[in-house]
């Protein structure tokens, strides 16, 4: 049986370690040595995956989780997964447009903090997943608002954080590429994945990014705000014109012995309004409406 995974998770199910060709107990001194070495690698931004084995008799049935116990730690693999070149400018552009960026990752605190430092994201306090497991919804909502970086998260942790942010009235977009991101992708208002993501992430996402550059996120935000602003213009113009027509006919009919406008006249007016509204989708939008997200407010009518 060969198992691989996050270092701490593998260490929890190992009782021995292969050292200089011999199998020795995984005692506290050895455990401390392993953790010191891997923490040094994490601080350098290297992700660490542990590998363990166990000899089991052959069987015809499936292997189960209970078999993952008393394993032998064979070693660990450290690899660098650098951020995309466009990550830093994309984060800066999103912040300038009023988008708050939060990092929800299954990586260790040290690796995640190192990557955030490289892309210029100020994270402050790092919250690991085990700290949010026993929090209530209100406590988690308050924590999610003030925290930028969550590390060592399970798929359910990510989903909970996205859900509480939505409950607080935020519009949440979640970008994920792995199978662990699928629950959060479904829970978000807008699930975003990339063309090279795993199948389950692409299926759970609402939008698939075909371009490699993350600057497409800023372009999408700006274009979406332009579309939303022009939709509001159309709704306000249509509602005000139709209300004016109907209200004037109702009031005039109450005091005049004749109809001030025939149905044909109303249809002609609507046609004229509709022709003028053809230009609204390509109308210019003010900078303040682009830089800050707008909300639909019926009172504006």
Where are the regions that the model predicts?
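Cytosolic catalytic headpieces and adjacent flexible linkers of membrane translocases
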Residues: 1-164, 168, 182, 194-196, ...
